[in-house]
């Protein structure tokens, strides 16, 4: 199996500018207007232009204001503070400043379309730090 990351956005050009500036991703292929592949992570990212108010799934309408969802991306970085500065400069909203945890340093943000994500810098032990003695 493999993983693809599809992100609905109301404007693919704005999405492309954000994701390339915030994360250093590069454009792979363009599949017509409003559908672009971004490369640079272990899995490709596909930005799909979908208008707000259109049906997403199960009758739920797409909305691009900030919303909570139990599913989000954690982007693992080498320097969380530098990554936060880069993402915010590109248009992200910082929702929770970077904090230290047993497994590393983590900050919570949202992209310009309301999709939440975390920036995570693992400690030497990473999630193994959460295992019992």
Regions found by a protein language model. Give the residues of each.
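Conserved beta-strand-loop-alpha-helix junction that forms the acyl-donor binding cleft
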Residues: 9-11
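Residues forming the ATP-binding cleft of Hanks-type serine/threonine protein kinase domains
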Residues: 77
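Short, conserved charged micro-motifs
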Residues: 14, 80-84
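Vicinal oxygen chelate
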Residues: 1-4, 25-74, 84-110, 121-133
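Short glycine-/small-residue motifs
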Residues: 116-119
């Amino acid at each position: 199996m493999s993983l693809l990351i599809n992100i609905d956005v109301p404007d693919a050009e704005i999405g492309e500018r954000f994701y390339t500036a915030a994360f250093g991703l590069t454009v792979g292929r363009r599949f017509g207007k409003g559908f672009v592949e971004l490369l640079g992570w272990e899995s490709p990212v596909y930005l799909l232009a979908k208008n707000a108010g259109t049906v997403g799934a199960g009758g739920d309408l797409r909305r691009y204001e900030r919303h909570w969802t139990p599913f989000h991306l954690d982007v693992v970085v080498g320097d969380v503070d530098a990554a936060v500065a880069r993402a915010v400069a590109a248009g992200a909203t910082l929702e929770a400043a970077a904090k230290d945890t047993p497994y590393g340093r983590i900050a919570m943000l949202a992209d310009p379309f309301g999709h939440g994500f975390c920036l995570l810098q693992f400690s030497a032990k990473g999630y193994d730090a959460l295992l019992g003695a």
